[in-house]
Swiss-Prot record:
Name of the protein this chain belongs to: NEDD8-activating enzyme E1 catalytic subunit
Pfam families (UniProt xref): E2_bind (PF08825), ThiF (PF00899)
Family: Belongs to the ubiquitin-activating E1 family. UBA3 subfamily.
Effect of L370P: Impairs NEDD8 transfer to UBE2M
Annotated phenotype, changing I195A: Reduces affinity for UBE2M
Residue ranges of the region described as Interaction with NAE1: 242-248, 292-295
N-acetylalanine PTM sites in chain numbering: A2
Residue(s) at site: Determines specificity for NEDD8: R211
Length: 463
């Protein structure tokens, strides 16, 4: 190529040369696999090394399994989910499903790189799938603009691995319970083929964690529930009478003024994704803050308090997503021993990582298959049982529904989620366990939004 050629001619010539090379190499063809495309993956799968699994035998079959067969479900398409989807798609995983119930907000664009300004208001799952399917040849990402609770066991059973990038503990607990419900036991022995591995990642600011869960074999979410701090709630007396923080003012407007004034019409609930709703809360919070000489109420803080927004840092998402994607790769190929089983990451003051083995809980309400023993006096009221279920660090239920078999009939003692039944069963809360007809050794079945399964409790009376 002559040195005097203009830049445009040089560019065209380079494009022609690249096109010729692609034609010689076979191009993308129908498979979208040009020569050398998967060399970076083959290095891990077609040769052994000091870190490979002792039973691993290098072959071409593992790569073909990734490309043609392995189905992975990614739950969450936010900051962590975008990183996960990108990593998996570029690592050879082609059969990917993604679930997310959220839509794209302008505040997402600084770190959720699969989205653009034109996508604001559209479902995250659909936009992420479109982007990857268009950008990565032969990648088939199937979107689901749904809640995870919208799908049954048949749907989840089809996947080889499930990886989560969630910001909700309730959602984590639900999918954990679903995967445990898929397990099959023969004469008390777990059938390994019924296990769907769960890779869970989470981030908050400059901190993050990743864990590998083999349901029925290793510690599940419920086994280590105490590791999750309870949601911070401000006392109502402080919010109403003695506010000291800007958050107190915002919570006052959210919890008291909104239901009282109903600014957007009777029965219209507060929508944290509606700018008009947030603006109304913001203005009223400013007014209350000025009454008590409190500074710091901003629109961003208002949005964060109303939506319970967790602070996000793009670099933390990238690190944790890389760990999770690596674990998916290790389990899918059996080439390397997976993480055992919990990793924490912290780069607040430097860089710190630590890995440890979380142990299974013998009486775990989710994976132990044992009824949970609870002790109460016969004179204790049902309200005390309800408080125990919601306040216990090892249970942390949100709206438990309690049923029991009395005189051969299944009887609902209390159910909160259905208004008519809640009104009918509310008087039971002030009754003693003895008055309700419960006896020592009675089994109580408790349903809750945190799990798709019913949790069994065995009631023991204390003297």
């Amino acid at each position: 190529m002559a040195d005097g050629e203009e830049p445009e001619k040089k560019r065209r010539r380079i494009e022609e040369l690249l096109a010729e090379k692609m034609a010689v190499d076979g191009g993308c063809g129908d498979t979208g696999d040009w020569e050398g495309r998967w060399n970076h993956v083959k290095k891990f799968l077609e040769r052994s090394g000091p870190f490979t699994h002792p039973d691993f035998e290098p072959s071409t079959e593992s790569l073909q399994f990734l490309l043609d067969t392995c189905k992975v479900l990614v739950i969450g398409a936010g900051g962590l989910g975008c990183e996960l989807l990108k990593n998996l798609a570029l690592s050879g995983f082609r059969q990917i499903h993604v679930i997310d119930m959220d839509t794209i907000d302008v505040s997402n664009l600084n770190r959720q790189f699969l989205f653009r300004p034109k996508d604001i208001g559209r479902p995250k799952a659909e936009v992420a799938a479109e982007f990857l399917n268009d950008r990565v040849p032969n990648c088939n990402v199937v979107p689901h603009f749904n809640k995870i609770q919208d799908f049954n066991d048949t749907f989840y059973r089809q996947f080889h691995i499930i990886v989560c990038g969630l910001d909700s503990i309730i959602a984590r607990r639900w999918i954990n319970g679903m995967l445990i419900s898929l397990l099959n036991y023969e004469d008390g022995v777990l059938d390994p083929s019924s296990i769907v591995p769960l890779i869970d990642g989470g981030t908050e600011g400059f901190k993050g964690n990743a864990r590998v869960i083999l349901p029925g074999m290793t510690a599940c979410i419920e086994c280590t529930l105490e590791l999750y701090p309870p949601q911070v709630n401000f006392p109502m007396c402080t919010i109403a009478s003695m506010p000291r923080l800007p958050e107190h003012c915002i919570e006052y407007v959210r919890m008291l003024q909104w239901p009282k004034e109903q600014p957007f019409g009777e029965g219209v609930p507060l929508d944290g994704d509606d700018p008009e709703h947030i603006q109304w809360i913001f203005q009223k919070s400013l007014e209350r803050a000025s009454q008590y000489n409190i500074r710091g109420v901003t629109y961003r803080l208002t949005q964060g308090v109303v939506k319970r927004i967790i602070p996000a840092v793009a670099s933390t998402n990238a690190v944790i997503a890389a760990v999770c994607a690596t674990e998916v790769f290790k389990i899918a190929t059996s080439a390397y021993i997976p993480l055992n089983n919990y990793l924490v990451f912290n780069d607040v003051d430097g860089l710190y990582t630590y890995t440890f083995e979380a142990e299974r809980k013998e009486n775990c309400p989710a994976c132990s298959q044992l009824p949970q023993n609870i002790q109460f006096s016969p004179s204790a009221k049902l309200q005390e049982v309800l408080d125990y279920l919601t306040n216990s660090a090892s249970l942390q239920m949100k709206s438990p529904a309690i049923t029991a078999t009395l005189e051969g009939k299944n009887r609902t003692l209390y159910l909160q989620s259905v208004t008519s039944i809640e009104e009918r069963t509310r008087p039971n809360l002030s009754k003693t366990l003895k008055e309700l007809g419960l006896v020592d050794g009675q089994e109580l079945a408790v349903a809750d939004v945190t799990t798709p399964q019913t949790v069994l409790f065995k009631l023991h009376f204390t003297s």
